[in-house]
């Protein structure tokens, strides 16, 4: 028995052979590609974090500006927990790094899925990714420059006069972060509508008929994503409704382009069928003639098979008659003049007659 080579190179070659034989090379290649894309995204966020870390306090001051401008004179934000003055700016720096790196992260996602798409799909996805990024930043900017001043101006004066308004920095960061991402994703409504129309899930006419329900859903989404105050709910619901109408308007152009492309494909297919009609007819005729010739030759083979089966049946019946009559009847049959033992075979001129043993003739007088 030969010893198995247990060296690392042999194990590596053996694993490569197994991967190649089992067809897992493509799957492992996708996993390696996904790992590389994720590492690039993490490295990009880490580099941005290191660049922004020295400015962590300035970032928090800029983020707190919409609230600071509406706070009563002499009021400041507080830190309830001991480590909050250090960890809250650190957390804000990490979130800012992710926020800035969104275009690069989307590009890595696009680079991973693009090789598996058709050419027309790649032409469609690239503008959608670009528009999604722009709309996300527009939603965040809308929250910072429009929603925050209105909401904080209302909340700072809505409480009792004898209550000191001093928000916690941790709660404030959670509040504004949720609004940032909520408005960023809400501004993706036009992209979602266009995708649904392109895929064929809905049509622009159906979306127009669904308008009243869309308004109700907009207020429900705003109630879920925003803090529990009516003003911020309206501040989110109204943009959702406007973006729904904008997406409906844009989707009509994509729907018309989709119908035109489908008509062109159908026309090309019908034109190709017309151009090749003569050749197709000739090919069909030749195919039918070959089939007819084959069917004409088949009965000869069938007759031969039937004759062979009939011969086998006669042999089986002869053996069965010999075993039933016994040796005495066979001897008596051989001593009769001009008499042969009955084999029960069918007449040759009646191939389709049922196979039954022919009756014995009466003994001739001596």
From Swiss-Prot:
Q: Does Transcription count among this protein's keywords?
A: no
The cellular location(s) given in this protein's UniProt record come to: Cell inner membrane
Q: Name one GO biological process term.
A: intracellular protein transmembrane transport
Q: Where is the composition biased (Basic and acidic residues)?
A: 281-290, 301-318
List the biased-composition ranges (Acidic residues).
Answer: 266-279
- GO molecular function list: proton motive force dependent protein transmembrane transporter activity
Q: Which Pfam families match?
A: TatC
Q: Where are the transmembrane segments?
A: 42-62, 70-90, 97-117, 134-154, 179-199, 207-227, 230-250
**Principal location:** membrane
Subunit description: The Tat system comprises two distinct complexes: a TatABC complex, containing multiple copies of TatA, TatB and TatC subunits, and a separate TatA complex, containing only TatA subunits. Substrates initially bind to the TatABC complex, which probably triggers association of the separate TatA complex to form the active translocon.
Q: Briefly, what is this protein's role?
A: Part of the twin-arginine translocation (Tat) system that transports large folded proteins containing a characteristic twin-arginine motif in their signal peptide across membranes. Together with TatB, TatC is part of a receptor directly interacting with Tat signal peptides.
* Protein's name according to its UniProt entry: Sec-independent protein translocase protein TatC
Lineage per the UniProt record:
Bacteria, Pseudomonadati, Pseudomonadota, Gammaproteobacteria, Chromatiales
């Amino acid at each position: 028995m030969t010893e198995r080579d247990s060296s690392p190179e042999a194990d590596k070659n053996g694993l490569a052979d197994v991967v190649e034989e089992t067809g897992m090379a493509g799957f492992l290649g996708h996993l390696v590609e996904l790992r590389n894309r994720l590492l690039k995204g993490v490295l990009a966020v880490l580099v941005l974090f290191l660049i922004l870390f020295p400015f962590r306090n300035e970032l928090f001051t800029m983020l707190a500006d919409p609230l600071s401008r509406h706070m009563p004179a002499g009021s400041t934000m507080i830190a309830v927990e001991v480590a909050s003055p250090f960890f809250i700016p650190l957390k804000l720096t990490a979130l800012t790094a992710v926020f800035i790196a969104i275009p690069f992260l989307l590009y890595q996602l696009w680079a991973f899925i693009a090789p598996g798409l058709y050419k027309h799909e790649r032409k469609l996805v690239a503008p959608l990714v670009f528009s999604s990024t722009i709309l996300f930043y527009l939603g965040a900017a809308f929250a910072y420059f429009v929603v925050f001043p209105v909401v904080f101006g209302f909340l700072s004066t809505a409480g009792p006069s004898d209550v000191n308004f001093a928000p916690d920095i941790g709660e404030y960061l959670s509040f504004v972060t949720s609004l940032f991402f909520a408005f960023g994703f809400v501004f993706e409504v036009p992209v979602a509508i266009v995708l649904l129309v392109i895929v064929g899930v809905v049509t622009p006419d159906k979306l127009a008929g669904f308008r009243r329900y869309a308004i109700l859903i907009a207020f429900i989404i705003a109630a879920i994503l925003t803090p529990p105050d009516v003003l911020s709910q309206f501040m989110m619901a109204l943009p959702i409704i406007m973006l729904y109408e904008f997406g409906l308007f844009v989707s009509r152009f994509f729907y018309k382009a989709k119908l035109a492309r489908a008509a062109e494909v159908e026309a090309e297919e019908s034109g190709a069928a017309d151009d090749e009609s003569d050749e197709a007819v000739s090919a069909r005729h030749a195919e039918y003639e070959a089939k007819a010739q084959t069917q004409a030759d088949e009965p000869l083979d069938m007759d031969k098979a039937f004759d062979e089966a009939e011969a086998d049946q006669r042999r089986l019946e002869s053996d069965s008659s010999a075993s039933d009559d016994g040796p005495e009847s066979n001897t008596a049959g051989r001593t009769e003049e001009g008499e042969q033992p009955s084999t029960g075979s069918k007449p040759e001129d009646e191939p389709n007659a049922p196979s039954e043993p022919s009756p014995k003739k009466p003994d001739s007088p001596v």
